[in-house]
């Protein structure tokens, strides 16, 4: 093997590294290595995305039910539906250990202060899913003893329609809640309080899928599956 030795001439021009000709030198290989090994940006943005990812994929529900919709909610925990796919299979019996509560069923006036007290015992961040027509708007019980919608006394994040909704509808509501949590901007500590919290605007699904419903031309009869 033969080698050729070349003497370095410091006065020779160098197009890649011109000394004294340009203030900055462009080296694509060097830039690639810098971007691979050095983070350029705000640490707050990275932490926010990581925290939101952990929150939305580890939602612990509070275990309580009000009426028949609770039966459909518990069906989502069985093997055919497998709510564990979304990280929400850890049912908690204490509101202090739960991340979200599902108002499943008819909310009577005498139960409203109890539900509100349970909600206040939950730690931030916390969310609420209203499941079923009775929880959403009172349903067919337009009487003095039924609250006409749990949003009269609780901040509801997701509404699941139906009487009662199927387990698939509850799972879709859970996915919508995960999507909303992924876009939230809130302080990393619950001690800070409610200031500075940004929640993404979630439009109604009937508005988002309006064109899709209009495009349907083949409507099956009610007795077909």
From Swiss-Prot:
<keyword id="KW-0479">Metal-binding</keyword>
<keyword id="KW-1278">Translocase</keyword>
<dbReference type="GO" id="GO:0009060">
    <property type="term" value="P:aerobic respiration"/>
</dbReference>
<keyword id="KW-0472">Membrane</keyword>
<keyword id="KW-0813">Transport</keyword>
<comment type="function">
    <text>NDH-1 shuttles electrons from NADH, via FMN and iron-sulfur (Fe-S) centers, to quinones in the respiratory chain. The immediate electron acceptor for the enzyme in this species is believed to be ubiquinone. Couples the redox reaction to proton translocation (for every two electrons transferred, four hydrogen ions are translocated across the cytoplasmic membrane), and thus conserves the redox energy in a proton gradient.</text>
</comment>
<dbReference type="GO" id="GO:0005886">
    <property type="term" value="C:plasma membrane"/>
</dbReference>
<feature type="binding site">
    <location>
        <position position="69"/>
    </location>
    <ligand>
        <name>[4Fe-4S] cluster</name>
    </ligand>
</feature>
<dbReference type="GO" id="GO:0050136">
    <property type="term" value="F:NADH:ubiquinone reductase (non-electrogenic) activity"/>
</dbReference>
<dbReference type="GO" id="GO:0005506">
    <property type="term" value="F:iron ion binding"/>
</dbReference>
<keyword id="KW-1003">Cell membrane</keyword>
<dbReference type="GO" id="GO:0051539">
    <property type="term" value="F:4 iron, 4 sulfur cluster binding"/>
</dbReference>
<dbReference type="Pfam" id="PF01058">
    <property type="entry name" value="Oxidored_q6"/>
</dbReference>
<keyword id="KW-0997">Cell inner membrane</keyword>
<dbReference type="GO" id="GO:0045271">
    <property type="term" value="C:respiratory chain complex I"/>
</dbReference>
<dbReference type="GO" id="GO:0008137">
    <property type="term" value="F:NADH dehydrogenase (ubiquinone) activity"/>
</dbReference>
<dbReference type="GO" id="GO:0015990">
    <property type="term" value="P:electron transport coupled proton transport"/>
</dbReference>
<keyword id="KW-0408">Iron</keyword>
<keyword id="KW-0520">NAD</keyword>
<protein>
    <recommendedName>
        <fullName>NADH-quinone oxidoreductase subunit B</fullName>
        <ecNumber>7.1.1.-</ecNumber>
    </recommendedName>
</protein>
<feature type="binding site">
    <location>
        <position position="163"/>
    </location>
    <ligand>
        <name>[4Fe-4S] cluster</name>
    </ligand>
</feature>
<dbReference type="InterPro" id="IPR006137">
    <property type="entry name" value="NADH_UbQ_OxRdtase-like_20kDa"/>
</dbReference>
<feature type="binding site">
    <location>
        <position position="134"/>
    </location>
    <ligand>
        <name>[4Fe-4S] cluster</name>
    </ligand>
</feature>
<comment type="similarity">
    <text>Belongs to the complex I 20 kDa subunit family.</text>
</comment>
<comment type="subunit">
    <text>NDH-1 is composed of 13 different subunits. Subunits NuoB, CD, E, F, and G constitute the peripheral sector of the complex.</text>
</comment>
<feature type="binding site">
    <location>
        <position position="68"/>
    </location>
    <ligand>
        <name>[4Fe-4S] cluster</name>
    </ligand>
</feature>
<keyword id="KW-0874">Quinone</keyword>
<dbReference type="GO" id="GO:0048038">
    <property type="term" value="F:quinone binding"/>
</dbReference>
<keyword id="KW-0004">4Fe-4S</keyword>
<dbReference type="InterPro" id="IPR006138">
    <property type="entry name" value="NADH_UQ_OxRdtase_20Kd_su"/>
</dbReference>
<keyword id="KW-0830">Ubiquinone</keyword>
<keyword id="KW-0411">Iron-sulfur</keyword>
């Amino acid at each position: 093997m033969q080698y050729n030795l070349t003497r370095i001439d410091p006065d020779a021009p160098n197009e890649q590294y011109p000394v004294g000709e340009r203030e900055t030198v462009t080296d694509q290989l060097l830039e690639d290595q810098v971007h691979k090994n050095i983070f350029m940006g705000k640490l707050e943005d990275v932490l926010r995305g990581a925290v939101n990812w952990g929150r939305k994929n580890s939602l612990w529900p509070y275990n309580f039910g009000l009426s028949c919709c609770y039966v459909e909610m518990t069906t989502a925990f069985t093997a055919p539906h497998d709510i564990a796919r979304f990280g929400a299979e850890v049912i908690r019996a204490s509101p202090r250990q739960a991340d979200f509560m599902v108002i499943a069923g008819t909310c009577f006036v005498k139960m409203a202060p109890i539900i509100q007290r349970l909600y206040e015992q939950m730690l931030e961040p916390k969310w609420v899913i209203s499941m079923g027509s009775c929880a959403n708007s009172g349903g067919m019980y337009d009487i003095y003893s039924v609250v006409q919608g749990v949003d009269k006394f609780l901040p509801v994040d997701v509404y699941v329609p139906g009487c009662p909704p199927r387990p698939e509808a509850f799972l879709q509501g859970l996915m919508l809640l995960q999507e909303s949590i992924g876009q939230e901007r809130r302080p990393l500590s619950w001690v800070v309080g409610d200031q500075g919290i940004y929640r993404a605007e979630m439009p109604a699904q009937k508005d988002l899928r309006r064109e899709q419903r209009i495009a349907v031309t083949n409507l099956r009869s009610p007795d077909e599956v």
